């Protein structure tokens, strides 16, 4: 599992969407059904938050942190994706059409 587009993400069921941005950014705006676990909290305590039997999609503003996190967790046996577009591109595409 790896990068995923927002359109493909919308087609999937039983996936946990995790916003890894800071709490303030999440509070200002986030994807529907997303929960917030900031990057540094998650990377330092992933086993506390995640279950290897579940599927996750991470996103951040530009996808750099979410991609590195997803790659690391996939190597450890977790099932994860990251949002290719990043949240800022998603937001621009949704609000400027």
Language-model features: where?
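Rhodanese-like catalytic fold shared by cysteine-dependent sulfurtransferases
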Residues: 1-7, 12-15, 22-55, 61-97
């Amino acid at each position: 599992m790896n990068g995923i587009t927002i359109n493909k993400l919308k087609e999937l069921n039983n996936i946990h969407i995790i916003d890894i941005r800071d709490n303030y950014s999440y509070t200002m705006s986030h994807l529907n059904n997303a929960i917030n676990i900031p990057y540094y909290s998650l990377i330092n305590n992933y086993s506390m938050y995640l279950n290897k039997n579940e599927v996750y999609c991470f996103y951040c503003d530009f996808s750099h942190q979410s991609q590195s996190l997803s790659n690391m967790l996939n190597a450890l046996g977790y099932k994860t994706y990251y949002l290719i577009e990043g949240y800022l591109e998603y937001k621009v595409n949704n609000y400027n059409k």
